[in-house]
């Protein structure tokens, strides 16, 4: 199984992430790791290079970018280095359990060909998810932890290169389902994801970029009324910006204009 992990100033998470993958390897021996670094300025690359047990993995690649080209682009690059039938994408601020990949492999083996991707369960704060309690089928998956059939990932040309960060997973999920494949949520395939310090926490960068890219997706997949609602949401956020989003007005305005002119004739 190919595992792609994107890093950017991620020195805080490297050892914990790698140590957990090493433990999981005991039950799923053929793990190939592809780290794509988006031009970190800290010790991320040095820590990856110096990891003393990297030879215990079937493959351990570090791909360094000369500039940060975004989360989706970096994942696409990492996936291009592998060849396995299943590609797994993990955020660097995650830890897998010893049986994570073993359970994933069992579920994949039991899945029909119409299942194109499998989303992991995130702990301690579960990713908001609506899914069929019997089949596990869901409408979209989080890019923080999921696996996909390589042939499908390649067919869809991976993540959209125009989406720098946030909502690239929603876009990919939509295109996957539009190609007549399904996404299965797997509650028994668990990871720890340290994205938030507390439940309900707001990350300004995530909120702002999600807002901008939400509008992009409304242009791409929605109706005229969907787009108008998106602009209305933009206006509300822009004029009522306060609290953790204070200081983001210029970014929001830039995203508004950029999305309008880029996708006006999409």
Protein language model features and the residues they cover:
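Short beta-strand/loop segment that forms part of the nucleotide-sugar
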Residues: 30-39, 63-65
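A conserved acidic beta->alpha catalytic loop
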Residues: 20, 37-46, 67, 94-97
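A short, conserved alpha-helix in the catalytic core of glycosyltransferases
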Residues: 104, 146-148, 152-157, 162-190, ...
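Active-site-adjacent helix/loop segment of glycosyltransferases
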Residues: 183-265
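Conserved donor NDP-sugar-binding/catalytic core segment of glycosyltransferases
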Residues: 95-132
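Short aromatic/hydrophobic "clamp" motif used to bind/position activated sugar donors
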Residues: 87
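Short, well-formed alpha-helical segments that are part of the catalytic scaffolds
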Residues: 10-24
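Glycine-rich, basic loop-to-helix element that forms the pyrophosphate-binding segment
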Residues: 64-82
